[in-house]
Swiss-Prot record:
Lineage: Eukaryota, Metazoa, Chordata, Craniata, Vertebrata
One GO term (biological process): vasodilation
Region of interest (Disordered), ranges: 1-36, 135-172
Source organism of this protein record: Bos taurus
Gene: BLOC1S6
Family annotation (Pfam families): Snapin_Pallidin (PF14712)
Name of the protein: Biogenesis of lysosome-related organelles complex 1 subunit 6
Superkingdom of the organism of origin: Eukaryota
Coiled coil, from the record: 125-167
Compositional bias ranges of the Basic and acidic residues kind: 143-164
């Protein structure tokens, strides 16, 4: 089997390259590494390396700088978002505490109404006790008056009986 050679100027493949027969191996397919002998053959010029490095940097550096700037902007935006989120959380906590405060006010109104009712009851009881004390005082005064009248009545009766009892006549 023959290995095709390099294409001819008209683009048609010809036979094996010059100096190679059909059974020979093609160059580059040997058992040796493709890098062997390459280092000795190349003479590295510092200027060429520098120009290649500058070209590589000039090609990729703007994209890298834009990426770096975009990352910095994203980081700043993320910090702003975190601050905003913390503010919203604090607002939510304030709203939640406002709900607690509203519940406390509702409870305070409830207990205030209870206190008002208790105060009304106490005033009513105070009025009743005052009336009862006045009535008791009047009854006591009436009883004392009746007792005094009875005592006076007894004394009058005693005096009358004394006057009605026979008296020995005085000897004159």
């Amino acid at each position: 089997m023959s290995v095709p050679g390099p294409p001819s100027p008209d683009g048609v493949l010809a036979g094996p390259p010059e100096g190679l027969e059909a059974g020979d191996l093609t160059p580059g397919l040997s058992d040796t590494s493709p890098d062997e002998g390459l280092i000795e053959d190349l003479t590295i010029e510092d200027k060429a390396v520098e120009q290649l490095a500058e070209g590589l940097l000039s090609h990729y550096l703007p994209d890298l700088q834009r990426s770096k700037q975009a990352l910095q902007e994203l980081t700043q935006n993320q910090v702003v978002l975190l601050d905003t989120l913390e503010q919203e959380i604090s607002k939510f906590k304030e709203c939640h505490s406002m709900l607690d405060i509203n519940a406390l006010f509702t409870e305070a109104k409830h207990y205030h109404a209870k206190l008002v009712n208790i105060r009304k009851e106490m005033l009513m009881l105070h009025e009743k006790t005052s009336k009862l004390k006045k009535r008791a005082l009047k009854l006591q005064q009436k009883r004392q008056k009746e007792e005094l009248e009875r005592e006076q009545q007894r004394e009058k009766e005693f005096e009358r009986e004394k006057q009605l009892t026979a008296k020995p006549a005085k000897r004159t």
